[in-house]
Amino acid sequence: MIADTPTPPYYAVIFTSTRTQGDEGYADMSTRMVELAQQQPGYLGHESARDDIGITVSYWQNLEDIRNWKMNTEHLLAQQYGKEKWYSGYKVRICKVERDYGF
């Protein structure tokens, strides 16, 4: 589903990852992170896809909201598990969306 974002400007966090073979607890944690993100101030929506690489784009009102999400206690735990057992590599990019269009 394509996220229904407001009129720009707003911010996008692009999380690109490659997975390890380990799956233990991943699906549950992924579901929990979506639920938790949706409760955070400034969260606007997200889009996600996975094949050989995974790409999740989450949308946020401002940079402070992104910082607060990054430092959320449960999210910090998920980040730790991701580094230790679920991801063989990842990259995070933060962008300001100045224009969007579509139908």
Question: Where are the predicted features?
Answer:
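Short S/T/G/P-rich N-terminal loop/turn motif that feeds into the first structured element of a domain
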Residues: M1-G54, L63-M71, Y87-F103
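C-terminal structural segments of small proteins and small subunits
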Residues: A78-K85, G89
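Sensory beta-strand/linker motifs that couple input domains to effectors
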Residues: Y59
